[in-house]
Design a protein with these regions (language model features):
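Amphipathic alpha-helical interface elements
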Residues: 1-144
Length: 144
């Protein structure tokens, strides 16, 4: 039996929800006058900006996870300096994006072994643990 990848998707959705809200709060604090232009849209490539415009997105919660991680990475120096974050958070954000891509773009008959699956869940957990949200622990407890 192979791992149920819908659990990974559920966790990735949690990351997207939390990261979007967190980015909005932190970026507004760093850029009180126009964070959307200077901190969000500036972080996206031309294709991503076109998608944002077509979708009518106006806050980080409305961006997909790869875009959120792009915004996070672009603003990392300011976030790190202003909020004195753990540097590991940067690596964890990149890893979560890679996990999302792996499961979203998985071939139909691709086999994901249990060890890799549990490692991916643990990586997402470590990233979400930064937010110290109680619902995360509840969701994760059902995976083990």
């Amino acid at each position: 039996m192979f791992p149920d990848t819908t659990r990974i998707q559920m966790l990735v959705d949690k990351v997207q929800d939390f990261l979007g809200g967190w980015l909005e709060q932190k970026l507004k604090a760093i850029h009180p006058n126009g964070y959307w232009q200077s901190a969000v849209l500036a972080a996206l490539d031309e294709r991503q900006r076109k998608i944002v415009k077509e979708d009518g997105s106006s806050c980080p919660q409305e961006l997909d996870l790869p875009m959120q991680v792009s915004v996070f990475r672009y603003n990392w120096p300011s976030l790190l300096e202003t909020f004195h974050l753990n540097r590991q958070l940067y690596n964890d954000a990149v890893a979560v994006k890679q996990i999302r891509n792996k499961y979203d773009h998985k071939k139909r008959n691709a086999v994901i072994d249990w060890e890799r699956y549990h490692h991916d869940i643990e990586t997402i957990y470590l990233f979400l643990n930064f937010y110290k949200e109680k619902p995360i622990k509840f969701v994760l407890s059902s995976f083990y």
